[in-house]
Swiss-Prot record:
One record GO biological process: protein ubiquitination
SUBUNIT field: Component of the histone H2B ubiquitin ligase complex (HULC) composed of at least brl1, brl2, rhp6 and shf1.
GO function terms (MF aspect): histone H2B C-terminal K residue ubiquitin ligase activity; ubiquitin protein ligase activity; zinc ion binding
Entries under PROSITE patterns matching the protein: ZF_RING_1, ZF_RING_2
Keyword Metal-binding assigned: yes
Organism name: Schizosaccharomyces pombe (strain 972 / ATCC 24843)
InterPro entries: E3_ubiquit_lig_Bre1, Znf_C3HC4_RING-type, Znf_RING, Znf_RING/FYVE/PHD, Znf_RING_CS
Gene label: brl1
Reaction catalysis annotation: S-ubiquitinyl-[E2 ubiquitin-conjugating enzyme]-L-cysteine + [acceptor protein]-L-lysine = [E2 ubiquitin-conjugating enzyme]-L-cysteine + N(6)-ubiquitinyl-[acceptor protein]-L-lysine
Pathway in which the depicted protein is active: Protein modification; protein ubiquitination
Enzyme Commission number(s): 2.3.2.27
Similarity comment: Belongs to the BRE1 family.
Protein name: E3 ubiquitin-protein ligase brl1
Keyword Endoplasmic reticulum recorded: no
GO cellular component, as recorded: HULC complex; nucleus
Amino acid sequence: MSVVNESRKRRRLIHSEKETRRLDLGEEDDLELFQKEAAWRRSREYEHLTVLEKKLYEYWESLVLKLDHYVAAALENHEQSFEELEKITASLYQPDDNLQTLDLSLAEFSLIKDAQNYLNKYASYFQAHEPTLQKLAKFGSFKLKETPNVHEWIDQRQVHFTSMINYRTSQLKLALLKRKLSFFREALNSAELEWKRVQQDQLTSASERSIENIADDIPASEPKAILENGEGCLNDNDNISKLKNNFQSQADLMQANINSKLDELSQKSTRAAQLYVDIMGITDERVSREPHYLELKGVLSSNEEKIESINRDLSSLFEDIQFFISQRTKRQKDIIDLKLACVKEKQQLIKTLESSLTQIRNERDSLVAKQQMQYTNNLFFDDMMLLLSNLSNARVAILEGYSNRLCIWDRIERSKTGEMNNVLDEKEEISASSALEKLIKNNSCLEAELPSMYAAFDQSQSRLLKKYEELETKEKKALEMHYEKARATQKYFAAMKARDILMTEKKTLKLAENKEHDYIGKLQEREHALTKYESSLKAELEVYKQIKEIYGKHSVEVLTEDKHLQVKQTKLTQKLEDLIESVQKSGEKLMIMHQKLFHLQEEHTILSIKASYNKKESHLINQAYETQEAQVYKGMLKCSVCNFSNWKSKLIPNCGHAFCSNCMEPFYEHKTSTCPQCETPFSVSDILTIHL
């Protein structure tokens, strides 16, 4: 079941699952429902007033947590920086006391600067690392004086720390004040805007009525009521101005209270920090005045000097041993280099000899080939030369026979031609008869000799042809034998070359084996030398161990004294830590008390606001219960769209839902739209304004 604002005729309706009926304040159920709504509305208003206070308190707690985290991170950075500083001081240590300054690297200088920026938190922290700071002040790049006084520097850093805390608290105070002032200004502005909206709604409702309707509808007794309503509007203006003044006065009071409380908190925090610093200074003075502490410091300084002298002696011994080892290694290297140079020279000589051998063999092969081709002592070759000479003689004889035969044939032809000429010219050449007779006789003799000559020539020709054929066959055989001999000689020379190559390879392999044997021998020599060197190093190590034992016996006494001093120092540091813990616990208790006080003050302010609000609203609530209209006004819910406005001035009659004027402004732009709660359609002309 829920209560909804409706039009003036259907002023208050109750929507249930079964029916929709009007609110009747005479019944007990309706009255209880109305009172529940009023209580819910008041609680929502209280929550709205206290939300920003809670947000501010949460913001304050977050800032305090941030400050705690900042302090913890600073302490961690201090520890890291002091570890780095201890490393730097260990590397900065020099045995010469005459050195006053020492050039640092860029990284080391940046570390020292970071440490110098972070050294601003607690006196005990500085006291624990006082010797390292003294060394840095003596040997470092940020030298303060010839006789450094670190306490003054520590005091300066402590003052810087307190000023930093004050600055942080003042920043937090300003942030809180700004948030409070913005909250009260927003509340005042919202009240003024709501009152202006109410006035505008009243003016619009008055302008809607025309003068004629007022004359017809209102009786003679109603002008008095209208005058009374006008006086009520004036009274409302006076009440609003009073409320505004009350809000401003309350804001000023709250601001003054917050400022005073924050000032008290800052004063107490600074006082606690100063007390803490004073306690640590007193403890430092007391510890420094104790004679036992001074004696321990003197013993520590003497022990440090002894350790420095021992370290110097050891460093000189190490330098001598290293110098001796370096000289020995240099000599061994020089001997090995000389041996390697000799081996390289021998290798070059072997290469030159091999190249000369190859040249000599090539020249020998060429000379052998030439001699075999020019001067041969073989009988078969002589026979071939005789055959060739016989063939050449036979050819000459055959050619001579052919030439003789041709001459004979020429003579015969000439004789035949001469007979024919003589028969024709008998009469002309009678004088040459004697010559013809001679020729005829000769011709007859020749003709008688011709058949025998032909037979002899044929026989000689056949013999010559046979001899020629035999010579050709022998010549072919001789050529084949010559080719075979040449091939055999080539094979012989190839085999000789292969034999020479194999011999050279065999020699090279022997040389390689000899080199390997030499190399293995050198390696063995090197192994023997290394074993000797190792034995010498072992002897040196034994000597060094003996020296170390001698110095160790002397340093045992120093170490025992150091242990006693360290035990005493740990006891003193434990006492200091106990004091620091007690101071920290007292500081934590103070902080807890401050937080409790702050929570109580906040609760007091919230209760005072609630009490003032109850005082202001009690008479209004009582007046609201007097009339039904006032009860309806008090029982109105907040706008369901924005959940902020306390006044629903616009009503949709179709569904009976009401909303504030700000939420209904965008619906005036369209002629038709739907309800934002139940989505029932309506037009702009249907929207009604609700009046008190």
